[in-house]
Amino acid sequence: MDDKKAGAGVSAEKQKALAAALSQIEKQFGKGSIMRLGDGEIEQDIQVVSTGSLGLDIALGVGGLPRGRVVEIYGPESSGKTTLTLQVVAEMQKLGGTCAFIDAEHALDVQYAGKLGVDVGNLLISQPDTGEQALEITDALVRSGSIDLIVIDSVAALVPKAEIEGEMGDSLPGLQARLMSQGLRKLTGTIKRTNCLVIFINQIRMKIGVMFGSPETTTGGNALKFYASVRLDIRRIGSIKKGDEVVGNETKVKVVKNKVSPPFREAFFDILYGQGISRQGEIIDLGVDAKIVEKAGAWYSYNGEKIGQGKDNAREYLRENPDIADEIENKVRLALGVAPLNTVAGAPAEVEG
């Protein structure tokens, strides 16, 4: 009995000491700097933005890319990396969000971005001279608390100042990796607090002398691999032809890393030249798989009404009737257990200091 009383006394003392420690932490670092998981103040539902591809949203498991996180999209040249990120920008703008594009490659095609649905008039763009400048601009934008999405294109083009000011043949090993490591350490906490999504586009390099395993690696060291909540590997796997003319690419995206849902899922979609990801084609294919769209012979129908003979005609019908396309997409999302399309981007919080 005495042991029980003594145990209860120690427990009460521990609780008192813990309460004092928590109070001290909150006083020093602000309210919300530490909390219990069961308190309900921590956001259980992850806010997402669609990638513009229904199949990829489903493969990500939460209905899109998570906000308040770092995302890396990498792949070979002309695989669709910039197209995919511009589609995400267009989707965020549809929700009323503010987007910024850090064009370190100095290669953004504004006309193409407009064709993909990006409101280029309201897109913030920066073409920094050095890697340090790019990451400082990113940090300032995130800290403002008024930006919903920032794209950095690309990690390979974030050249350290010392390299730009040095001679052409100078050997400066590890400078870019150090720059990325320092920049990401500084950024991650603020990104989470402001609910800003930051997408890094990256390129692939070949490691020399690799006998076993993949010789492929991404630029900028290992920091981004650790800090990224989602890593997407995008590849062109074929061509789409209309007669003899190539009109697009067949694309595969693998979710290589995912901290918000099970990883290693894959998505396949078409990227049409001048149009971007064929959303309507995906809605038809996934709608048929989920038995929401009926297919009889060459005819496609929805709710008992025929929407087109052949996939091209059905795709055209959905392009002309976006409300029906959205309705089918939301039904597919619900059937597969991912979040339906949102309507509001949500106001990010301002960060002090």
UniProtKB/Swiss-Prot annotation:
GO CC field: cytosol
Molecular function in Gene Ontology: ATP binding; ATP hydrolysis activity; ATP-dependent DNA damage sensor activity; damaged DNA binding; single-stranded DNA binding
Pfam family, one: RecA
GO terms for biological process, alphabetical: DNA recombination; DNA repair; SOS response
Keyword set, alphabetical order: ATP-binding, Cytoplasm, DNA damage, DNA recombination, DNA repair, DNA-binding, Nucleotide-binding, SOS response
Binding site for ATP: G75, P76, E77, S78, S79, G80, K81, T82
First-listed, main subcellular location of the protein, grouped into a coarse class: cytoplasm
CDD domains named among the record's database cross-references: RecA
Subcellular location: Cytoplasm
PANTHER family according to UniProt: MITOCHONDRIAL DNA REPAIR PROTEIN RECA HOMOLOG-RELATED, RECA
UniProt record similarity statement: Belongs to the RecA family.
Main function: Can catalyze the hydrolysis of ATP in the presence of single-stranded DNA, the ATP-dependent uptake of single-stranded DNA by duplex DNA, and the ATP-dependent hybridization of homologous single-stranded DNAs. It interacts with LexA causing its activation and leading to its autocatalytic cleavage.
Protein name: Protein RecA
Species annotation: Cupriavidus necator
